[in-house]
């Protein structure tokens, strides 16, 4: 796989608390230069990114209920609606892990449904935080997302004890089938890991190390 091909898998990400306006502008410049799929940013920076990215082909992705997922569903839905109004083209919401652990699957479904309705056709990715779930819980959460026809299921916020694993990505892909995307995120920092995730079924990669990932491919392929 060539660097330009793998770049289209990458959501170039900057979600940590200390990110400044200059950090976001740099992120946008890098995304344009390297042809990344999107930038993934907190919603407060959407207007800034929109000014920078309009007409470039790089999309703006934002997060909702991040990173805990424990907000009221109505708050998540409003957050998604406002983010889209500001210019977000993709939304990554965090599932309510506490409800999963409580066995309240109808409420888990309702939480996702409310955000999905608020998105009104804007691509929705549902973050499962797989490091906190059993395999059975991952499967059940994926089945709900598949039945609701969300855009993607996503492994991780990157803010918990661990991120994506090849085994979890493969399980998610097996469960949702071929019509829903799988996004691997959290701890993906090099080319080898990225390719392993793609081979396991990931169709999107969330990473703050996108440049290092494609530079590894350049090194291996002898050029861009």
From Swiss-Prot:
Q: Name one GO molecular function term.
A: deoxyribose-phosphate aldolase activity
Coiled-coil-forming residues are none
> Which reaction is the catalytic activity of this chain?
2-deoxy-D-ribose 5-phosphate = D-glyceraldehyde 3-phosphate + acetaldehyde
Q: Which GO terms describe its cellular component?
A: cytoplasm
Q: Report the superkingdom from the record.
A: Bacteria
Q: What subcellular locations does the record give? A: Cytoplasm
This chain's protein is named: Deoxyribose-phosphate aldolase
From what organism does this protein derive?
A: Actinobacillus succinogenes (strain ATCC 55618 / DSM 22257 / CCUG 43843 / 130Z)
């Amino acid at each position: 796989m060539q660097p330009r091909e793998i770049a289209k898998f990458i959501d170039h990400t900057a979600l940590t608390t200390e990110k400044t306006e200059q950090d976001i502008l740099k992120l946008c410049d890098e995304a344009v230069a390297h042809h990344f799929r999107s930038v993934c940013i907190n919603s407060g920076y959407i207007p800034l990114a929109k000014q920078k990215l309009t007409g470039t082909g790089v999309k703006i992705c934002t997060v909702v209920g991040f990173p805990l997922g424990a907000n009221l569903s109505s708050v998540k839905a409003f957050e998604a609606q406002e983010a889209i109004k500001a210019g977000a083209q993709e939304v990554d919401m965090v599932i309510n892990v506490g409800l999963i652990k409580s066995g309240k699957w109808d409420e888990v479904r309702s939480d996702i449904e409310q955000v999905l309705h608020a998105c009104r056709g804007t691509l929705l990715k549902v973050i499962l935080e797989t490091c906190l779930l059993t395999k059975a819980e991952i499967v059940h959460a994926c089945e709900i997302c598949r039945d609701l026809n969300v855009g993607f299921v996503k492994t991780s916020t990157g803010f918990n004890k661990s991120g994506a694993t090849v085994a979890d990505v493969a399980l998610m892909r097996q469960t949702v089938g071929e019509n829903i995307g799988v996004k691997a995120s959290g701890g993906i920092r090099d080319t080898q890991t990225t390719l392993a995730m793609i081979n396991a079924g990931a169709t999107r990669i969330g990473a703050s190390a996108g440049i290092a990932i494609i530079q590894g491919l350049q090194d291996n392929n002898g050029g861009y």
